[in-house]
Amino acid sequence: MAEQPIRYEFIKECKQTGARLGRVHTPHGSFETPVFMPVGTLATVKTMSPDELKSMDAGIILSNTYHLWLRPGHDIVKEAGGLHKFMNWDRAILTDSGGFQVFSLSKFRNIEEEGVHFRNHLNGDKLFLSPEKAMEIQNALGSDIMMAFDECPPYPAEYDYMKRSVERTSRWAERCLEAHGRSDEQGLFGIVQGGEYEDLRTQSAKDLVSLDFPGYAIGGLSVGEPKHVMNRVLEFTTPLLPKDKPRYLMGVGSPDALIDGAIRGVDMFDCVLPTRIARNGTVFTNEGRLNMKNAKYERDFRPIDEECSCHTCKNYSRAYIRHLIRCNETFGIRLTTYHNLHFLLHLMEQVRQAIREDRLGDFREEFFERYGYNKPNAKSF
């Protein structure tokens, strides 16, 4: 049998927490896990160049099937030689299936066994996305890791609805495997659903593991549920997944959730949070978040975070960044975006080092204390 395009290499387990250190091998290089993946929705991580992403050690980025299908069209990306060539990125790329966007962006949708009828959120045109179509688009994009097309139920959802949804997602996963045309070049991950119901998560994981995907995602979290619910779901879901395959928690990117997810056995994370809040002038620091529009930074000539080694912090002051953000200058957004992405990528580097040293529990305690998560009514990002 030919070697799988995606392979997980286990390195070690943290004796203090059970978190795992590993490495994922792809056709476009390998990366250590736990890892955070910057999101490049439209084949670009907003305001960042590929070289800038490399300078902060991003080993894999995420791109969005739904958005690239609408603009510029997967046929154009294929003609360009695939997503890697199109955007000049020679490291790993993961594409989502488009399912989440269909369920979150379209106000009008009709779910049937065959797929989902919905309206284009840009112009109202009628569209149809099925497991087969999602595979066709992702095969054309040529990402290293593709995602199965799943149903994304709202939170909270009634048990009976969720049960039907999980069963449909399992049937769709099987159809995705059958329709996947480049299984020797692209790895396809299944997505475990089931909301907060343990028996449904168990059923979903069992169904998908029996299909032997090269990796598994945990979907349906970070959709509005409290953080303790997410942690509880992870506690009973990750042990259901194979130890020799990567585990990916979709749509999660706040520092606390990254650390807590790693402690519960997750290997891969993605989220638009660092880039989205950067565009509003909000930045991560080791002492918590700062809003750079705040008047108190008008004459503050220190870097955003004096412990940070990123390009922004080595070269520019809070006062300068505040000025740029308040004047809606693109360069200000570039500086805050670079810093936030670097902050999360560096945080994951610290998490990996703490796993090596069997002290991730201690690291969590120190980080949470400084960041402000232990304060009463602390915000979760």
UniProtKB/Swiss-Prot annotation:
Organism taxonomic ancestry: Bacteria, Bacillati, Bacillota, Bacilli, Bacillales
Recorded name of the encoding gene: tgt
Pathway recorded for this protein: tRNA modification; tRNA-queuosine biosynthesis
Keyword Transferase assigned: yes
Protein name: Queuine tRNA-ribosyltransferase
Record key words, sorted: Glycosyltransferase, Metal-binding, Queuosine biosynthesis, Transferase, tRNA processing, Zinc
Essential cofactor(s): Zn(2+)
Gene Ontology terms, MF aspect: metal ion binding; tRNA-guanosine(34) queuine transglycosylase activity
Main function: Catalyzes the base-exchange of a guanine (G) residue with the queuine precursor 7-aminomethyl-7-deazaguanine (PreQ1) at position 34 (anticodon wobble position) in tRNAs with GU(N) anticodons (tRNA-Asp, -Asn, -His and -Tyr). Catalysis occurs through a double-displacement mechanism. The nucleophile active site attacks the C1' of nucleotide 34 to detach the guanine base from the RNA, forming a covalent enzyme-RNA intermediate. The proton acceptor active site deprotonates the incoming PreQ1, allowing a nucleophilic attack on the C1' of the ribose to form the product.
Gene source species: Bacillus velezensis (strain DSM 23117 / BGSC 10A6 / LMG 26770 / FZB42) (Bacillus amyloliquefaciens subsp. plantarum)
EC number: 2.4.2.29
Subunit relationships: Homodimer. Within each dimer, one monomer is responsible for RNA recognition and catalysis, while the other monomer binds to the replacement base PreQ1.
GO cellular component, one term: cytosol
Biological process per Gene Ontology, one example term: tRNA wobble guanine modification
Entry similarity comment: Belongs to the queuine tRNA-ribosyltransferase family.
Chain sites annotated for binding substrate: D96, S97, G98, G99, F100, D150, Q193, G220
UniProt-listed InterPro entries: ArchSynthase1/Queuine_TRR, TGT, TGT-like_sf, tRNA_ribo_trans-like
Active site: D96 (proton acceptor), D270 (nucleophile)
